[in-house]
Amino acid sequence: TEILRLMASGFSNKEIANSLGVAEGTIKNHVSNILSKLGVRDRTRAVLKAFELQLV
């Protein structure tokens, strides 16, 4: 949910990676998994769905 929270704050993958101290590729993988698990196709819809489900 930390990555979702940062996505909701408008952070890019690179900014999230820097914030968490991991590689940008790691964040890309996590974002891809988040989109898949939420059943959405883009970051905006993922954030909206996360709010609907009260994940953030």
Cite the ranges covered by each PLM segment.
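Pre-recognition alpha-helix immediately N-terminal to the DNA-recognition helix
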Residues: 1-2
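Recognition helix of helix-turn-helix DNA-binding domains
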Residues: 10-45
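A generic structural signal for secondary-structure junctions
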Residues: 39, 51-52
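Short C-terminal tail/terminal secondary-structure segment
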Residues: 54-56
